Amino acid sequence: DIANDPMSAGRQMGGHFTTHSLDKNFNWKNLTEQYNSSSDISPTGAQMPRLLGLAQASKVYRELKSKNSNKFSKNGNEVAWGTIGNASTSEGVFFETINAAGVLQVPMVISIWDDEYGISVHAKHQTTKENISEILKGFQRDSKSNGYEMLKVHGWDYVELINSYQ
């Protein structure tokens, strides 16, 4: 029932918010006129391949000359932004996505929320070096090769967090 559950009409778990891409007549909305949120999913780390796909779509739209693409993209200038907890970075799909995004050089931002605990265990029991930032240093962009720009900030410092996104 769309009236009682406007996010998914009862087809998702609670708290898995999404924006509607179709209007009430099931036609595509102009997605460039709204902020868009892809529904979250429950399996740990499973949002990562989808994040890569959204970023790749933005890159593809930069080269696409379709007359109907203006409802979906502003010339491929979108950035896909996703979040993941430090525990989920132990999942294989996280590293596959990180590597593929670096190879493809897609417009993607990932925020990793690292509280040193994953669901119920300390990072020392699941993360090499107990610090995902240390592991990812090899992906840092430099003058000789592609990679990422990586920033490490205190998530509790709101001003520092905002400045890192700008």
Can you say where each PLM-predicted feature lies in the sequence?
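Structural signature of the thiamine diphosphate
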Residues: 157-166
